[in-house]
Amino acid sequence: MSDKKPVHPSELSINDGIFLVKLARKAVEEKLLRGVSIEPPRDLPEIFLRPGMTFTTIETLHPDGKTTLRGCIGFLAPIYSLVESTIKSALEAAFNDPRFPPLRPEELDNIIFEVTVLSEPEEIIVRNRWDLPNMIKIGKHGLVVEKGWFKGTLLPVVPIEYCWDEETFLSETCIKAGLQPDCWLDPSVHIYSYEGRAFREKLPRGEIFERDMIREYREICRRMIR
């Protein structure tokens, strides 16, 4: 592993995020259409060569404008450089997500790419486990739950999509880890949080923007509750 400091998502510019999303799509298209595994571009700025953690999410865009998940895989540890992590997570999401069949060429015009850049997970330490929800900000934090061999994570965007509160977010991450929903109350269970910034295509191969997940949560979930 590199001795360089891992990239924190707050260091990225919007142009950095745009580059990563375009790179994720290019990696998948080159592999699918030409059987080529792309290499990281040369002469990249230093930030892309430092260790980084990314998740690539691929969604299918339907005629009614709604999207459904098509693949999502990534890295929670700074094993690769930021650029390598983006390429590898994109390929894994497209071809090796066990929940879905491998992506097909005819789908390329109807899929949307989203790259989430993560900070290193940090354990949340509290004296009273009931204080854990107060340590989480929906739209900013993703969660990791770990106990022995059991481990699961949910990205910051997930509670927005379902309008979960903090306790539900904790419980659903417990379930993702293969544990009981109230596992977060167990002192032997380790709870970690990390920050994430998500960059996304508006349309397939279209404009790329950064999601304001805190605003999305406030606006979308308030509307749903009403």
UniProtKB/Swiss-Prot annotation:
Pfam families: AMMECR1 (PF01871). Residues 15-210 form the AMMECR1 domain. PANTHER family: AMME SYNDROME CANDIDATE GENE 1 PROTEIN, AMMECR1 HOMOLOG. NCBIfam families: AmmeMemoSam_A, TIGR00296 family protein. This is Protein Smar_1309. It comes from Staphylothermus marinus (strain ATCC 43588 / DSM 3639 / JCM 9404 / F1).
